[in-house]
């Protein structure tokens, strides 16, 4: 198959939905010969917010230390290949097509059929093996206990801040969600966690004690280094990343940490496009993937530090599984006007439903049929434009702003 044919087949497997469980991915990884080789270090990352940024920091710092690193994250923003990186480079189209062709032939013989995420994980691990990666960083897709990435034995486990998200799958209390994510902890393997609410901390400590996994909680942000990603929360993510690499026996020093954090590139996380780079804009355009109330709180803090006293023309969209009323409650005070649009996703919330979820004291709002029209209206206000509510929206917006072919996804 060509690359486009291969990804078309892959995206067609999204019809199989999400299947939590480890038997399927274990079978697929075993039959595709994708399990990491002996001696390869694996870092496994779960949590609600900050997973991608923390993974990207670990990858960048490890590469600055001279390690050949494989990075598996989700979702992608613009191009599927973003999910699978070696040494900071996306998997090439030709190798992606070859791997997916082999996987299609294998999957046709398997019952039940592997899911989109399981296939992506198998493709990533096979590519990491071919590239002789010394370190592999795996971000969970959802939860932890039954996430496909948990089929891969890890040497270090990382827990980023935990909040309420994916409640239809993981439970509707912090304790239930924490238990799902704590299940990635392995007997005797070191683990490190971001600061957590007390009820979450208790769950993590109990889980660590049960499997005798040495667990450390980060107690202060990483200071004394320049960090490419804006916001005080990113210094906490940096501290978590450095601690995890230390547990993985990566030889760290000041220069490698500084180089990794300074040269880090992780789009869509308070990413600022200067006005001069956006046709028709007279103020910056900011993209942020905040898609739950906790992330919205973090975004509000970052906005107030970056744009003190300024309000945004906010372009907002969300998918149905998210607490968009809670997000809007926290972000509406940042906006002088709000422009709703449906994201390119079957689970997109209609603009009218988004508008109906606004708090009573919300600023003026308008609804549009697509992102391009909503963005065009927001730009005319002359205010900084904040595009937020979903990583799927951020991906669509980034493709629009960079004039890049967009591969929409539902997972």
Report each predicted region and the residues it spans.
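Charged, amphipathic alpha-helical linker segments immediately N-terminal to NTP-binding catalytic cores
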Residues: 1-18
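A conserved segment at the C-terminal end of the G1
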Residues: 41-45, 53-70
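Conserved catalytic-core segment of NTP-binding enzymes
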Residues: 142-146, 153-212, 314, 324-328
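C-terminal helical cap/extension that packs against the catalytic core
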Residues: 194-216, 280, 284-287, 328-384
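A glycine-rich beta-strand to alpha-helix segment
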Residues: 374-402
């Amino acid at each position: 198959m060509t690359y486009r044919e291969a990804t078309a087949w892959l995206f067609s497997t999204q019809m199989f939905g999400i299947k939590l469980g480890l038997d399927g991915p274990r079978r697929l990884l075993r039959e595709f010969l994708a399990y990491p080789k002996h001696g390869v270090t694996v870092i496994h990352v779960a949590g609600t917010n900050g997973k991608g940024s923390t993974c990207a920091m670990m990858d960048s710092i490890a590469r600055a230390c001279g390690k050949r690193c494989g990075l598996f994250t989700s979702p992608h923003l613009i191009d599927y290949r973003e999910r699978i990186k070696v040494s900071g480079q996306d998997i090439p189209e030709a190798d992606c097509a070859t791997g997916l062709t082999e996987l299609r032939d294998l999957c046709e013989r398997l019952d039940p059929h592997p899911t989109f995420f399981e296939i992506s994980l198998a493709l990533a691990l096979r590519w990491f093996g071919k590239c002789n990666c010394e370190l592999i960083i795996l971000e969970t897709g959802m939860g932890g206990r039954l996430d496909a990435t948990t089929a891969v034995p890890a040497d270090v486990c990382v827990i980023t801040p935990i909040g309420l998200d994916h409640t239809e799958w993981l439970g509707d209390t912090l304790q239930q969600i924490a238990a799902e994510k704590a299940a990635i902890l392995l007997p005797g393997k070191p683990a490190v966690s971001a600061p957590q609410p007390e009820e979450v901390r208790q769950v993590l400590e109990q889980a660590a004690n049960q499997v005798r996994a040495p667990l450390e909680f980060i107690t202060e942000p990483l200071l004394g280094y320049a960090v490419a990603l804006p916001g005080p929360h990113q210094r906490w993510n940096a501290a978590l990343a450095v601690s995890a690499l230390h547990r993985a026996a990566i030889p760290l020093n000041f220069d490698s940490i500084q180089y990794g954090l300074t040269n880090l590139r992780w789009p869509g996380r308070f990413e600022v496009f200067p006005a001069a780079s956006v046709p028709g804009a007279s103020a910056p355009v900011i993209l942020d993937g905040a898609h739950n109330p906790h992330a919205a709180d973090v975004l509000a803090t970052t906005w107030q530090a970056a744009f003190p006293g300024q309000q945004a023309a906010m372009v907002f969209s969300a998918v149905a599984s998210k607490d968009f009323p809670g997000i809007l409650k926290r972000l509406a005070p940042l906006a002088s006007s709000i422009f709703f649009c449906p994201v390119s996703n079957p689970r997109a919330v209609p603009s009218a439903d988004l508008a109906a979820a606004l708090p009573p004291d919300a600023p003026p709002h308008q609804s549009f049929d697509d992102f391009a029209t909503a963005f065009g209206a927001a730009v005319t206000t002359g205010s900084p434009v904040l595009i937020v509510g979903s990583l799927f929206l951020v991906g669509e917006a980034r493709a629009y702003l960079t004039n890049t072919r967009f591969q929409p996804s539902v997972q």
